[in-house]
Amino acid sequence: MIDIDESLVAELISEQFPHWSTLRIRAVPQQGWDNRTFRLGDDLSVRLPSGEAYAAAVEKEKRALEFLDGKLPVEVPGVMAVGAPSQDYPLPWSVRRWLPGKTIDENSLIDRVSLAVDLGSVLRALRSLPTGAGAAAGRHSFYRGCHPSVYSDQVQIALERLGDDVDAERCREIWLSATTSAWESEPVWFHGDVATGNLLTEEGRLSAVIDLGTCGIGDPACDLVIAWTYFDGEARAAFRESVALDDATWQRAQGWALWKALVTMSDQSSPDPGRTQQRVLARVLSTAP
């Protein structure tokens, strides 16, 4: 990972966008894994990939956001400028509009059933859009939007490493179910990382989706994983009804949730100091697809 701090951001802004150089720069409290984000004044943000693997998303996401702007029931962050690599920071980066609101993991009072309905509506709208401006799922999306079997080897490695710490038989049952169907319709838009930190709320309602760096065109099953990472009970059922996808897609979605939990727990993915993925795995194993 590249060491990115406020002084580096100030240097990049001063060199490439001096008209913004007087604006205050401050890191956001909750940082993602793929990118580092900084406030730039009150109305802008600076977003910098944390490593080379995430750099290709800068230009792709810019094109996607330009296309999606105004076409969804909620806002998306507009890209104001794209910065070039420099001597001190070797990757492209971007300046964006700052969207107000709290992420859903910061808003403990939100009505999850209403949120589930709203999110399902957003994902339905996303799937309905023309796909010409999007990129076909693949390496750039870390294979979100592809068939989950692309990660079968990682699942097997995880089960071997975890041994008796997990119910391997149930895991294999879910994985088999997930990998024996495929998206048979035309490829559609998917977000690729529908996570609690990428959904903004205002006045208790979903107001924006952010971080479309892994978006693309393909199988939308990956966008349903939040059914296990955040929703449960009535909210999960409301999300399932609102998003309006078939049982086979839900089976693949459960496979995506299983994969992420297993690879994280077996140290094949980003760190999980709060053991969130252990709790996700328990939900995945205890629910029917």
Predicted regions and their residues:
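Juxta-kinase regulatory segment immediately upstream of eukaryotic protein kinase catalytic domains
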Residues: 1-19
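ATP-binding pocket architecture of kinase catalytic cores
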Residues: 2, 22-149, 160-166, 184
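Short, surface-exposed alpha-helical segments at coil->helix boundaries
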Residues: 6-10, 62, 233, 237
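Helix-rich C-terminal or lid/interface subdomains of diverse kinases
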Residues: 26, 33, 104, 117, ...
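Active-site acidic catalytic loop and adjacent metal/ATP-binding pocket
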Residues: 33-40, 46, 79, 175-224
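Helical cap/lid subdomains and adjacent loops of hydrolase enzymes that gate the active-site channel
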Residues: 138-183, 242, 248-252, 278, ...
